[in-house]
Amino acid sequence: MPVLHNRISNEELRARMLAETEPRTTISFYKYFTIDDPKATRDALWQAFTALNVFGRIYLAHEGINAQISVPESNVEAFRAALYGFHPALDGVRLNIALDDDGKSFWVLRMKVRDRIVADGIDDPTFDASDVGEYLKAAEVNAMLDDPDAVFIDMRNHYEYEVGHFENALEIPADTFRAQLPKAVEMMQEYKDKKIVMYCTGGIRCEKASAFMRHNGFQKVWHIEGGIIEYARKAREQGLPVRFVGKNFVFDERMGERISDDVIAHCHQCGAPCDSHTNCKNDGCHLLFIQCPACAEKFSGCCSELCKEEMSLPEEEQRRRRAGRENGNKIFNKSRGRLNTTLGIPDPE
């Protein structure tokens, strides 16, 4: 039986990726369709994609597949053929090509089987995920933005919205998609007779969100085909005004794609205009936050003086302090006042 997981350290894998000379293309795609045996599907795709030197992150579940990957340019067409030929439901699936790509988005292939490809918290057996809203193409999106009867809803997390969004789009304040769905229904009650336009990064969240809105009685629901990535690409190709302002946050090493020159966010430490996300350099923290170059130098890439001080301690003492400390997925949120008292950083819960 072949080894169907990685046995090489992250450090070595990253070094190998950085040493590559062939350009890579960053691609994202998703598809809601029934997978009878996600584990067997995962193993078969692992072997096919490993043979093409694909890196990235792929989730599979009974409800479908969600993938963000990078592929060597010389293997893109072979990858497309392998994917399209793997299952009838994947034949012709839309591939979102990254807009602002240095080819260094991933350095390892990780494939996991999950309960859902997007954690939605929906347990209503009458919910029909296929009853989605209508797709909008780039020109139609711009027309809707000028329609006073239309309301745009951003179905991304607060840290994504903070650095970029469509003009006048409403933010659903939440840290997870699971928490956003009921909030969106609640917030949109006063707009129930309006045209509801939902969007996200690549389409996977807003597609399910549009079905959830329809499930809750909203009839005039649209969502942007291919999300922000496809909208910006098509608008540029067609010579249309790009009405997304700022940066599109992405979940890979790039942490963002520049859509417009506007910088609408601010450094979380000094307040200077900045939209560059980073993770705190303290291994016991890794808080996701926005930091300008001046503060990066001042705090040595850390989110606080406390983290900077901890970084200067002997490694053994740092490990002792990290032991037992909750870590991972910490996100700066200006709307919360509670702090992690150990480090003096915002609590992610």
Curated annotation (Swiss-Prot):
Catalytic residues as annotated in Swiss-Prot or TrEMBL: C200 (cysteine persulfide intermediate)
E.C. designation(s): 1.14.-.-
Domain of life: Bacteria
CDD domains referenced in this protein's UniProt entry, alphabetically: RHOD_YceA
Enzyme class, spelled out: oxidoreductase
InterPro entries in the record: Rhodanese-like_dom (IPR001763), Rhodanese-like_dom_sf (IPR036873), Rhodanese_C (IPR022111), TrhO (IPR020936), TRHO_N (IPR040503)
Gene3D superfamilies: 3.30.70.100, Rhodanese-like domain (3.40.250.10)
Compositional bias (Basic and acidic residues): 314-328
Keyword annotations: Oxidoreductase, tRNA processing
Limits of the Rhodanese domain: 146-240
Entries under Pfam families matching the protein: Rhodanese, Rhodanese_C, UPF0176_N
Region (Disordered): 314-349
Task of the protein: Catalyzes oxygen-dependent 5-hydroxyuridine (ho5U) modification at position 34 in tRNAs.
Family: Belongs to the TrhO family.
Name of the protein described by the UniProt record: tRNA uridine(34) hydroxylase
Originating organism: Cronobacter sakazakii (strain ATCC BAA-894)
GN (gene name): trhO
